[in-house]
Amino acid sequence: MTFVPVIPEAYSHVLAEFESLDPLLTALRLDSSRLRCTSIAVSRKWLALGSTGGGLNLIQKDGWKQRLFLSHREGAISQIACCSHDDDYVAVATSQGLVVVWELNQERRGKPERIHVSSEHKGRKVTALCWDTAVLRVFVGDHVGKVSAIKLNTLKQAKAAAAFVMFPVQTVLTVDSCVVQLDYLDGRLLVSSLTRSFLCDTEREKFWKIGNKERHGEYGACFFPGRCAGGQQPVIYCARPGSRMWEVNFDGEVLSTHQFKKLLSMPPLPVITARSEPQYDHTVGSSQSLAFPKLLHLSEHCVLTWTEKGIYIFIPQNVQVLLWSEVKDIQDVAVYKNELFCLHFNGKISHLSLLSVERCVERLLRRGLWDLAARTCCLFQNSIITSRARKTLTADKLEHLKSQLDLTACSELISQLDDLILRFEPLESACSSRRSSISSHESFSILDSGIYRIISSRRGSQSDEDSCSLHSQTFSEDERLKEFASHQEEEQPEQGCGANRNEESASHSPVMSEVDKSEAFLPFSIALPFRSPSPLVSLQAVKDSVSSFVRKTTEKIGTLHGSPELKEPFESKDADRAHEEEVSAVTCPLEEDTEEKEIHQPPKEDRLQELTAATAEAMTKLLDPLVLFEPKVLRMVLLEWLSQLEKTFAMKDFPGISNTSSPTVKSNLGAHLLGETEKRVLDEESGEGRRVSLVTEEAGGQITCDPVSNLSEPSADRFRVCSPYAITNSLQRDLAELTTLCLELNVLTSAMESVGGHVDRASQQLSPEILACRFLKKYFFLLDLKRAKESIKLTYDSPCVWDTFVEGLKEMARSNPAYTELEEGDLPTGLQLLDGSVPSDSPLLIAFATRLYDRFGESALRACIKFYPSISPSDIAQLCRHHPAQFLAYLDSLVKSRPEDQWPSFLEFLLQPESLRLEWLLLAVSHDAPPSTSTVDDEGHPRPHSHLLSWGYSQLILLLIKLPADFTTKEKMTDICRSYGFWPGYLTLCLELERRREAFTNIVYLNDISLMEGDNGWIPETLEEWKLLLHLLQTKSTRPAPQESLNGSLSDGPAPINVENVALLLAKAMGPDRAWSLLQECGLALELSEKFTRTCDILRIAERRQRALIQGMLEKCDRFLWSQQA
């Protein structure tokens, strides 16, 4: 057998084909020249195949067993699109240009039904289909450039609607040439034609051309969703001639051009498949100038495209070619996560997976493809020996692989594997030599789990044969269970928000980090000390650990299976988490990734296992509605779990911290919470960033410096912002859920909480606020910070607890260099620094906002508007609670940052809870307001024209008043407006509460007739109200008139409210005759001037003319109708 060449180290990923779909096509009868596949699509559940006969085959990916067949008489299937957010819907386009949307009714176990057939593109060739990512809407593009949208309802809604109701079809836009590709994300539709790309805002109906330069030919474009880590915004990648891509922001502006022409001169990587042996040619070719017909977002960091020559996968953010492989005659490609389904021009389908090299080898080992696995190891040995790969593909597995090869036929492979295993030695052995401490015949290696594995050098020994037989049995069982279901083994892409990488993996493998659900070689993992005095002691430790492991596992299984109803939820939960990293540690912000293992003592490990069991038991109980919805029972469950949490993270188990707290510290805890300032200083000399000094400035001026290891328990006045243990992701989630629930329900201490081991009676006498502060400091690293923030504001409403929470956020933020840099520069520089270093949804934004507020005051608060909703008005209210006027200015600016028509709805959304309405109204009327002497006279009545005074927040006050509220709240708001003299709001509320008599009384005192004029004027509606108004005028005339108005003399102000002005309004409203009778009845007719008489005469003339005009029109209509009858 020839020597296998070695691929350069830079290639860390590979395309692999683990199964052939030819038997599936044969079973579907899609392998003939008459009937073959024409289109393909894939979703989480289905693989959809369209055929030349008009049939749509939907095959369930779970086992490739269940399938649906949907027939179409409208012609062959040309395009398929599966709904990404609901697997129950699929859209197809036929060769006649019809678009058919199916509802599969899988949840109701009904028959699939057509819910819509669109003929909008009939007679044209549909070239692209795309689903909306949020609602049931399909976008369709054809060869003449027309793009339409089909808005759908569910089948139930369609049946409930009237028969004449049609599904709306809307033409989105028409481009100048054939639509090549459609993509949709967050309200934006991306259209790529033969000449350029277009970006459409489907909600606002706005369109942008991307770039200025046109191109001619099929070039694709796709969205690249932003990642939660780093708060990256979505971008767009558009293919350009000459192996180039445009990077475009979400507003359609071209940011940069990426050139891949020279990078594609590297030789292609082989596709790992059992069909043929992988071959690699080191010869570097010429640069490739390609046109990318379509771009697809693959995995998390990659963009995929293809040509007639092969498949190309890029990491565009790094301008890097991850790989390219020769796969001929590709017609179309459908992707889901890291799976590729390639449709070839001959109708065949290839199922490929994008995997890291070590995961690919593991999959080959599980399938028993020993020769192919060995060749892959030898080809990619430079990638396999990296520290990241060696954690997954250990030397133990390579030894087993070597033992399965034929010594005669695979001698070259065995020799190369031996060399590869020798290169593993420096990381596998912690001793000076692999063979120095045991014997010349045997050696040992320390696995990642801590097990000492004895490796015999005698290949033909009985122990090796037993081991091989055990592994073979494991492989055969695993292969039997996973037959025709390889998609369940697919490694999922690394999650951008929670993955931990070392430096080497970051440079060589930036795409994904997958972990299989099970490990065939290690049935369980047992942690042992790093060094053991002898192999006998190690074996005894293995025996004890196995006994403890079996006992605890039995107890845990008994607990979890106690209720048969809980079996299914746990299975589904485990299935969702099957591809997550199971051993990634929770990292402290100040720690760096190193290859040294932390030494955990067995007692601590046992304690963590006990906490894991207690957490699983508590989470199981929370699934019971009788526990979850019964506060007393729920609190008992949390108290029981909290006792185990306190035991696990007890202070006495960590060095450098005393076991008892002094009485002075306990008695003055409240003062410490508010009076101490904590500063964290990195030890510059250590270089590793692992030791931290906490410098505490006490009230008396004494400064103490206590160097503490990052594993030590913080004392009563210190925060723990990172975990002292290595905690798995799944356990971290459960701990965060339970710890946050304890904070929300005020379960802050258990009955057994004590530093010295006895019940701490002093802690039971502390107030809930101080207990909450202590709880925050002890378990800050476990909390869900977003939920904790809301709980502190709603449950505790204490400045002490809020300040403690903010101090904890500051401790976490100090690891960010931007937090220190905020001390320098002006406010715009600080905001720009904040935008680039902190994610927009991070809870740490409050810590940064506090730092900016301390430096710049109110201007910093106004700048925080851009961080809404991450920083809410309630956060700002806590931040500047000593300066309410600053909060009021922030709130006013926040509301006015929205379009004016959205002010009421936005303010109503902010008023959560409802009690804020009265607080904010009281703030608004008491700040930047005129003095009460200018609005209210000595008797408590409104001063004339005082409603025209200027109020700083009048718009905000009126918005608060006009929002819907209950009757009691409206009455309280009325009293507030009256007491402060805000008469426009007071009159509005009086009329709304049907207190019209009170309103007209105050209108008379305000003495402004304009209040009763115009469309928005307050006019009496009944005869009794007019009599009341006239009576008020009579009463007013008996009192001495005011000497001057607000702006000087009465003549300078608005028209006053007097008998004549009111009489004119009465005549216009009721007619001159009825007005004159009412005035005579009230005894006011003698006070009227000639102006009133002339006005009444004019009104009578106008009334007669109007009656005559109406009479004439009626007569003409009557004559016309009679003439029509004749």
Curated annotation (Swiss-Prot):
One of its GO terms (biological process) is pigmentation. The keyword Repeat does not apply. The keyword Phosphoprotein applies. Keywords: Cytoplasm, Phosphoprotein. Widely expressed, with lowest expression in skeletal muscle and spleen. It is found in: Cytoplasm, Cytosol. Its main location: cytoplasm. Residues 461-514, 560-579 are annotated as: Disordered. The modification Phosphoserine is found at S532, S534, S693. Residues 477-490, 564-579 have a biased composition (Basic and acidic residues). InterPro entries: Beta-prop_HPS5-like, HPS5, TPR_HPS5, WD40/YVTN_repeat-like_dom_sf, WD40_repeat_dom_sf. It comes from the Eukaryota. It holds the Pfam family TPR_HPS5. GO terms for cellular component: BLOC-2 complex; cytosol; early endosome. Coiled coil: none annotated. May regulate the synthesis and function of lysosomes and of highly specialized organelles, such as melanosomes and platelet dense granules. Regulates intracellular vesicular trafficking in fibroblasts. May be involved in the regulation of general functions of integrins. Belongs to the HPS5 family. It is linked to Defects in Hps5 are the cause of Hermansky-Pudlak-like syndrome, a syndrome characterized by hypopigmented eyes and coat, melanosomes greatly reduced in number and morphologically bizarre, kidney proximal tubules secreting lysosomal enzymes into urine at greatly reduced rates, platelet dense granules deficient in critical components, such as serotonin and adenine nucleotides, leading to functionally abnormal platelets and prolonged bleeding times, and mast cell granules undergoing unregulated 'kiss-and-run' fusion at the plasma membrane. Component of the biogenesis of lysosome-related organelles complex-2 (or BLOC2) composed of HPS3, HPS5 and HPS6. Interacts with HPS6 and HPS3. May interact with all alpha-integrin chains that have an aromatic residue before the first lysine of the conserved KXGFFKR motif, including ITGA2, ITGA3, ITGA5 and ITGA6. This is BLOC-2 complex member HPS5. The lineage of its organism: Eukaryota, Metazoa, Chordata, Craniata, Vertebrata.
